[in-house]
Regions:
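Catalytic phosphate/metal-binding cores of nucleic-acid and nucleotide-processing enzymes, i.e., regions
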Residues: 140-143
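Intrinsically disordered, low-complexity regulatory regions
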Residues: 1-138
Length: 143
């Protein structure tokens, strides 16, 4: 499990870096998003992953990796929005937004490690495309 934790921390660091850069550029503009808007964004990203896998080509020079990063970040935004509720404007500082990001990333890590213990990392035995399809189906189910 040590490798899983390190892999998670590496991926979250990449996601956090992009979140921080966008926060610097735009501020917490996402605070105005309602839960349905956040899940719509996650659905759009998951659907693009499926489209890229199906078609095998893209017209926009951004691959699947960027979409997964966006899904992680929108997921954390969604958790923040559920905690704070949506706002009429960007009502928190960048520092507060980053602290909330870190809080939910830590909670996700703890939950993943607990589930990995109980399920013995069964997800590692799944075929990658099945894992992605399952992820997309779950997004669609909750949207």
């Amino acid at each position: 499990m040590k490798d899983t934790k390190q892999q998670f921390e590496h991926v979250i660091a990449l996601c956090r870096d992009l979140f921080s850069k966008k926060l610097h550029d735009y501020g917490p503009a996402w605070r105005i998003l309602r839960p349905a808007s956040v899940t719509d964004q996650i659905f759009i990203k998951a659907n693009r992953i499926r489209s890229i896998e199906t078609k095998g080509v893209t017209l926009i020079d951004e691959g699947i990796r960027a979409e997964f990063i966006a899904i992680v970040n929108y997921g954390i935004i969604g958790l923040i929005q559920l905690e704070l509720g949506y706002a009429e404007s960007a009502d928190i500082s960048n520092e507060e937004a980053m602290a909330l990001y870190d809080k939910y990333a830590k909670e996700a890590l703890e939950l993943m490690l607990a589930k990995n213990h109980d399920y013995d990392e069964a997800w590692r035995s799944m075929r990658v495309k099945i894992g992605r399809a399952s992820c997309r189906e779950r997004v669609c189910q909750y949207v």
